Amino acid sequence: MITGPAVDHAIEKAKIYPKLNVGLHLVLTNGKAILDPSEIPELINSVGEFRTSQFYSGIKYFFSIKTRKQLKKEIRAQFEAFSKTGLKLDHVNAHNHMHLHPTIFNLIIEIGRDYDLTAIRIPNEPPLNSIVDNKKEFMIRYFRWIFFMLFTYFMKKKCKKNNIIFNDIIF
């Protein structure tokens, strides 16, 4: 997380291992923005933190042109900050799987072209990757998985169209 509190330490450690594949984990929810709050007021609160509600943020990202412009600016700023580390960009994903959001995913591909993006980590998980001991939890996980698979299907198609590689599965 390029905006995380341990980013300098992580960069220092990554440079020790030049063959280590390092990705950009975009922060667009539940974390700090890289840009000043005055530049992206639609995205963050007064102390520079993204909103915690992924649902609310997702609605704004999709329907508000003003918010999308600011989102594009923030995503580009995070790509640029990663670029300045001197590390080779291996892949991109987003905190809390926010790159599943079609607006964010499209912006990642668009902006990523300027930063030699070749791979995106897609949250393609097995249907029930852990034991569930109650029916309600089972149903929640099952419907979440269906939702994810719908989005990941379209993500994979778009990646193929743009010559971007992606993982087969994650756990």
Model-identified regions with their sequence ranges:
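Catalytic domains of cell-wall/extracellular-matrix polysaccharide-remodeling enzymes
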Residues: 67, 76-160
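Structural preference for beta-strand elements that scaffold enzyme active sites
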Residues: 19-25, 88-93, 119-121, 165-167
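Aromatic/hydrophobic pocket-lining residues that form the small-molecule binding cavity
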Residues: 7, 71, 75
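Non-cysteine beta-strand/loop elements that form the S-adenosyl-L-methionine
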Residues: 21-28, 46-54, 122-123
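Active-site gating loops and adjacent loop-to-helix segments of metal-dependent hydrolytic enzymes
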Residues: 33-66
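Glycine/small-residue-rich hydrophobic helix-like segments
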Residues: 158-171
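Acidic (Asp/Glu)-rich catalytic clusters
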Residues: 7-21, 42-48, 83-84, 113, ...
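Active-site beta-loop-alpha junctions enriched in small/polar residues
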Residues: 1-4, 25-31, 95-97, 125-127, ...
